[in-house]
Structure formats: C-alpha cells, structure tokens
A protein has these predicted regions:
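The feature captures the beta-strand-to-loop junction immediately N-terminal to the Walker
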Residues: 37-39
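Helix-to-loop junction immediately C-terminal to a conserved catalytic motif
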Residues: 52
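Conserved ABC transporter NBD signature motif
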Residues: 60-72
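Hydrophobic anchor residue at the start of the ABC signature
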Residues: 79, 143
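Short coil-to-helix segment of the ABC ATPase nucleotide-binding domain corresponding to the Q-loop/switch region
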Residues: 89-96
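Conserved ABC ATPase "signature" region
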Residues: 96, 107-124, 177
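Conserved signature/switch motifs of ABC ATPase nucleotide-binding domains
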Residues: 128-131, 149
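Catalytic Walker B motif of ABC-type/P-loop ATPase nucleotide-binding domains
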Residues: 154-157
Length: 240
C-alpha cells in the first residue's frame, strides 16, 4: 500500500548539505499501525513528513497506492503534538473543520462531529473552547477532528509527547481501540519504546546521522496488551 524505495532526504544548512535520511526502504500494508521509533535527530519526523507529502524526498521515491507522493493529500490527516485547535472555535466547531473544507452540509457536519466526540468521550464538552480543556482533552479533540474526515492514513508526530504519563497511557488506550475499530493505516512517530510496543503492529527502529532503518520489529502480542507481561518486557529488551 505504501512503498518506500531507497528514499533519501538532504537539506542545505549554513551552505552545507545535511543528510537527514539515507537509503530508507519499507513497505506498509493497508490498515497497519506502524511506529517510527528512535532518538531525537534520527529522521523519524522527516520520514513521516516525506510520506505525508509535506516535504517529499529528493532521492528514491515514496508511493501510496501506486502514486508517487509529491504533495500532501486531502485523503490523509496529520495529528501533531501541539493539537492545532483553533482557540476561537468551540470543540464541536473544531471537529467540523475538515468537513467544511470537504463541503459537507451543515446538518451532516454536526452529526459526524458529534459521533466522533462521543467516540473520544467528549460529548459533554462540545460547547467548550480549547482553553477550557486539559492537554489530554485537547488531543482527543484533535483525534476526533482527524477521524471525522474518514482519512485513508493518519500520521501522528509524537502526539502524546507533551502530556503527563497517566494521560498519555489513557490516550494510548483510546488510539489503540480506535485503530482496531476503524481499521485505519496509522504511522506514529515516538521515541518511547514502551509506547511503540503498546501501539504498533510493527516498529521501524531508526538510527541517526544520517537517518536509516536499523531494523523492523514485528509486535506479536495479544490485542489486549499488558505492559507488565513477560512477552512485552522481552520485546522491550530486544529493541533496546
């Protein structure tokens, strides 16, 4: 479904060429949950932005459904760490944003937005404004907004990185449940090994300078994942 072949990405920095990605090759199936895992500066966000079309590769190629990626697609959405909510809009109106761009009727927009707010457990906050919500709740609104447009692929760039540990674990449970129910293709950037094991079908482990794929680890755990199980801890040690 997503084919990455010998992908490379270079930038000019202070007159010198900086190589962010080097010879990255990877195949991703439709409906897979893929985590890009590695330390800061290993190119995982660069790779995510290249697949999403925000900053295409300048070596090799990336194809989605046989089409080369040269720009962002309206079929896909990206969820960032900073939520990206509009402060002057209510929660309900924020979730409707992508639907407005797709020219969905007012009545249908409201119905769809309410459905996804219910899915993320925020129905009672639909008339609230982002400033009235906690960080975790704001990220739930961002997730509802992403799902409302029924995207083909959801890109998530360290979406829970700014949250406290307990809120992060709750949102991991939410996104795992949603990914199983909605069967979306999700590409998720993280530097947290346990988060990657908890969420992913496969983990792409990356190394820095330049960003390369070190190995791809299949996560063969039960659907109900237990962070304290022997299998989980064994996999963590294997990746580490």
């Amino acid at each position: 479904y997503i084919e990455i072949k010998n992908a490379g990405k270079t930038f000019l920095q202070n007159g010198e060429t900086f190589r962010a990605l080097d010879c990255v090759s990877l195949s991703i199936e439709k409906g897979e949950f893929i985590c890009l895992l590695g330390p800061s500066g290993c190119g995982k966000s660069t790779l995510l932005n290249a697949i999403a079309g925000f900053s295409p590769v300048n070596e090799g190629c990336i194809k989605i459904d046989g089409m080369e990626v040269t720009k962002p697609s309206t079929e896909n959405v990206t969820i960032f760490q900073n939520y990206g909510l509009l402060p002057w809009r209510t929660v309900l109106k924020n979730v409707q944003l992508g639907l407005e761009a797709k020219k969905v009727s007012k009545t249908e927009r409201k119905e769809i937005a309410e459905k996804y707010l219910e899915l993320v457990g925020l129905s009672e906050f639909k008339t609230s404004y982002p400033r009235q919500l906690s960080g975790g709740m704001q990220q739930r609104v961002a997730i509802a907004r992403a799902l409302a447009v029924d995207p083909e692929i959801i890109f998530m760039d360290e979406p829970f990185g700014a949250l406290d540990a307990i809120t992060r674990m709750k949102l991991q449970d939410d996104i795992l449940r949603i990914s199983k129910d909605q069967k979306k293709t999700i590409i998720f950037v993280t530097h947290d090994i346990e988060e990657a094991i908890y969420l992913a079908d496969r983990i792409v482990v990356m190394t820095p300078n330049p960003g390369r794929v070190k190995k791809v680890v299949e996560v063969k755990l039960q659907q109900s994942r237990d962070r304290t199980s022997d299998d989980f801890l064994e996999l963590r040690d294997k990746i580490f």
